[in-house]
Each structure stands twice: as C-alpha cells, then as structure tokens.
C-alpha cells in the first residue's frame, strides 16, 4: 500500500470583507505616508523590519497575506499609533481585556437541542 500523507493541503481563495480590505489599504497607505514623511527609503524600512523590499511594497499596498506582526512593526517604526494609544495606554487596555476574558468561560460550545417540555 502507498503512503498517504497525514497532512492534506487545501488551497482556498480567501475573501475579505470590504471593511477589512479598506482597513488594510488605509493602514498600508498610512505606513507609506509615514515612511515618506520621515524620509525613510523603502530599502531602509525593509531592512529595519527584516523583510525584502517586495514584502514592504505588499505591506504598503495593504496585502492581507503579509504577517500582521510585520505590518505592526512597520507602523511602529514610521510613528503610526495603533489603537490611538501610546505604550502605557495599550498596556492598560491589555490588562482590562485580560480581566474580562478571565471572567468568561474558557471554551464556547454550540447550543445543544432544546428539550421540548410543553405537554
């Protein structure tokens, strides 16, 4: 018998909502604007992020397939404040979200069948 891989790779075309697409485009263009305003070349910013120039171009075009950490790092380097907050505010926000998550169940389950008890 032949060997069957336990990993099946499925390629699916992912679609994003208009809101997500516009948000990515806005963030990408904002990164480009910040880079130009700070007089940072594409090559310099790419090196600081640790990516190729082509990956930086994808970031600036709002490509949804670029790792979010790279996009956030590019934004931080060019001075874009994400979440409209500074480091201390973000730390406080993280703490509050952690507190709220701690109050919720660890897992979410689909509701089961309801019992018909109307006789």
Can you name each region flagged by the protein language model?
Residues 3, 84-119:
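Short, charged recognition helix plus adjacent turn
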Residues 1-15, 117:
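Intrinsically disordered, low-complexity and often Lys/Arg-enriched segments
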Residues 9-37:
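A short, Lys/Arg-rich alpha-helix, primarily the initiator
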Residues 67-85:
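DNA major-groove recognition helix of helix-turn-helix/homeodomain DNA-binding modules
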Residues 29-44, 73, 102-109:
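Short basic helix-loop element that most often maps to the first helix and adjoining turn
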């Amino acid at each position: 018998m032949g060997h069957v891989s336990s990993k099946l790779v499925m390629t699916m075309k992912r679609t994003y909502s208009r809101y997500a697409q516009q948000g990515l485009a806005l963030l990408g263009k904002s990164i480009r604007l910040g880079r130009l305003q700070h007089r940072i070349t594409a090559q310099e910013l790419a090196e600081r992020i640790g990516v190729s120039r082509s990956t930086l171009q994808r970031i600036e075009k709002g490509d949804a397939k670029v790792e979010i950490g790279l996009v956030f790092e590019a934004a931080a380097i060019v001075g874009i404040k994400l979440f409209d907050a500074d480091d201390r505010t973000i730390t406080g926000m993280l703490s509050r979200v952690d507190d709220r998550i701690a109050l919720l169940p660890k897992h979410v389950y689909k509701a089961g069948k309801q019992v018909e008890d109307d006789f």
